[in-house]
UniProtKB/Swiss-Prot annotation:
Organism the protein comes from: Mesorhizobium japonicum (strain LMG 29417 / CECT 9101 / MAFF 303099) (Mesorhizobium loti (strain MAFF 303099))
Top EC class of this enzyme: isomerase
GO cellular component: cytoplasm
Name used for this protein in its record: 1-(5-phosphoribosyl)-5-[(5-phosphoribosylamino)methylideneamino] imidazole-4-carboxamide isomerase
Major localization class: cytoplasm
Keyword Kinase tagged: no
GN (gene name): hisA
Source organism superkingdom: Bacteria
Amino acid sequence: MILFPAIDLKDGQCVRLKHGDMATATIYNDDPAAQAKAFEDQGFEWLHVVDLNGAFKGQSVNSAAVGAILKATKNPVQLGGGIRTLAQIEDWLDRGLARVILGTVAVRDPDLVRQACKAFPGKVAVGIDAKGGKVAVEGWAEASSLGVVELARKFEGAGVAAIIYTDIDRDGVLTGINWDATIDLAEAVSIPVIASGGLASIADIVRMTMPDAQKLEGAISGRALYDGRIDPAEALAILQGRPEAKS
């Protein structure tokens, strides 16, 4: 079970939003590369990065910041936000990304996702962001008519490395992960699922260790880490089943 610390990039800075609304951005670090290294030093083994400007614009915007992150950390990095073409995917993977996350294009052009999975095995994840059970696109600014499981099932057997499932209503507001919807998705498909949106406390970390959550690959944490609501050492000890984990 992996805990992915999150770096969301807006105008070259590390920020957190509430419900995906750019107007609610709180700046946590103006040096994303330093933040990436700090997460590595705390013991995390992966890094989740989102180009927020890119998600809204439909093309990579914070490329310089992502490049600096890749140089600063030895941890594998997954990136989403504004990645729409095979050429972009190839470019980012050549620059050192461990995997790319395709969101809007997974709805608009699912065949491109399948092509990407064939071209770059194990390097392509799908981001499914939902509000009220329906998939949202274009930086969460537009709603679609697609259901979460309906979209996920389109990629069964395609070679998708993981599905990152975000409940927009819970994102950035520390209300706890939508465990019911997340576990329902994990049980509906064979693709590994990563939970995102709302992780709030050590209680959520403990919840990740429960038997019904074992189909998950992990969860993403942003604001709870930045605000100190989750202690990295304690969280990682719990997930790794180490004796020093607190009950």
